[in-house]
Amino acid sequence: MRSKNTAGVVLGHKNINEADKLVFLYTENFGKIIAIAKGARKITSKFTGHLETLNFVKVELYFGGKYTLVKEIETIKNFKEIRDDLEKLKNTLKVAEITNKLTYENEQIPNLTQLLENCIKLICSTKRPHVVIQSYTIKILNQIGVIPNFKEIETALDKKYLKYLNFIKTKPMEDAEKICLSMEEERNVDRIIQRLLQYA
């Protein structure tokens, strides 16, 4: 049983028991952590405001025999501008949901925290958040080993989609905006990504 400090990002939370929250964190030192924040639902809780989804935080975790507890937490960055814009909020929460789905407890993915922060910043500034989210999702799927080699795969998919998927897999997320796709093509890419997510 021990306490450890780390930096991380809140991927989500849900209410449990009468006054507690179950918190999903991705941490720099320990990867994905699922922890209990005791009393977090109380109005007077010290956790109030710090457990919001996509808050970047410093956190003290207590690793017990059965449960991990959030002992202390401090918000370092909260992207307040997102919460004042419903469209940006919707898109960033989607990114948090994807990240939470694709990471497993105690699993570490290299540079995920930085990738997630870059994605949020791009969503705040781009006119095409959809392609940023596509690029981010493909990059995580690639990190966890779900993505095939698009240059060598034998498939019935049109080559233009394979080329696009390989581009957003290998290039910086901001470069995804440079590729022009029709609305129909973007929807087709979404369908492909959804199929890939089923294998994750």
Give each language-model segment a name.
Residues 1-21, 26-200:
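Non-catalytic alpha-helical scaffolds and adjoining flexible linkers that form interface surfaces
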